[in-house]
Amino acid sequence: MAPRKGKDKKEEQVISLGPQVAEGENVFGVCHIFASFNDTFVHVTDLSGKETICRVTGGMKVKADRDESSPYAAMLAAQDVAQRCKELGITALHIKLRATGGNRTKTPGPGAQSALRALARSGMKIGRIEDVTPIPSDSTRRKGGRRGRRL
């Protein structure tokens, strides 16, 4: 059978998803790590914080509910985020670490440290690390009643 006429193969152009920058220049994003004792969120935005680039939670990576906040789930979530950032051309991240805060605990959950380590190990450059846990100047009353939580 003879080849068809009029059908020419078009050259595919390579389209970069990320910003156009010089070689060796860092493109920064902001990584918001929210580590509670029930889950860990790894959320990357642009520098303004308005445009979400990628968001993965520990619960998206593991099946059991009890493992959502584990360091392993946080590590898997951070690796996913780092891979997606590299695809989009983001090479460096500023970290904003957050615990539950308010009138609850001000210490980050178990996934915070491992998420940060996984980001660094996966080749992302780390800019500034900041703790943005909400700390009240004078809080509302904590739950548990007058005599506290009885175990």
From Swiss-Prot:
Subunit structure: Component of the small ribosomal subunit. Part of the small subunit (SSU) processome, composed of more than 70 proteins and the RNA chaperone small nucleolar RNA (snoRNA) U3.
One record GO biological process: translation
Location(s) in or outside the cell: Cytoplasm; Nucleus, Nucleolus
Residues with PTM Phosphothreonine: 133
Tree of life domain: Eukaryota
GO CC annotation: cytosolic ribosome; cytosolic small ribosomal subunit; nucleolus; postsynaptic density; small-subunit processome; synapse
Record keyword Phosphoprotein present: yes
UniProt keyword terms in alphabetical order: Cytoplasm, Isopeptide bond, Nucleus, Phosphoprotein, Ribonucleoprotein, Ribosomal protein, Ubl conjugation
UniProt cross-references to InterPro entries, sorted A to Z: Ribosomal_uS11 (IPR001971), Ribosomal_uS11_CS (IPR018102), Ribosomal_uS11_sf (IPR036967)
Composition-biased stretches (Basic residues): 142-151
Region annotation (Disordered) ranges: 131-151
PTM annotation (Phosphoserine): residues: 16, 139
Family statement: Belongs to the universal ribosomal protein uS11 family.
Gene Ontology molecular function, alphabetical: mRNA 5'-UTR binding; RNA binding; structural constituent of ribosome; translation regulator activity
PROSITE patterns in the record: RIBOSOMAL_S11
Chief location category: cytoplasm
Crosslink position(s): Glycyl lysine isopeptide (Lys-Gly) (interchain with G-Cter in SUMO2): 61, 63, 106
Reported function: Component of the small ribosomal subunit. The ribosome is a large ribonucleoprotein complex responsible for the synthesis of proteins in the cell. Part of the small subunit (SSU) processome, first precursor of the small eukaryotic ribosomal subunit. During the assembly of the SSU processome in the nucleolus, many ribosome biogenesis factors, an RNA chaperone and ribosomal proteins associate with the nascent pre-rRNA and work in concert to generate RNA folding, modifications, rearrangements and cleavage as well as targeted degradation of pre-ribosomal RNA by the RNA exosome.
Protein name: Small ribosomal subunit protein uS11
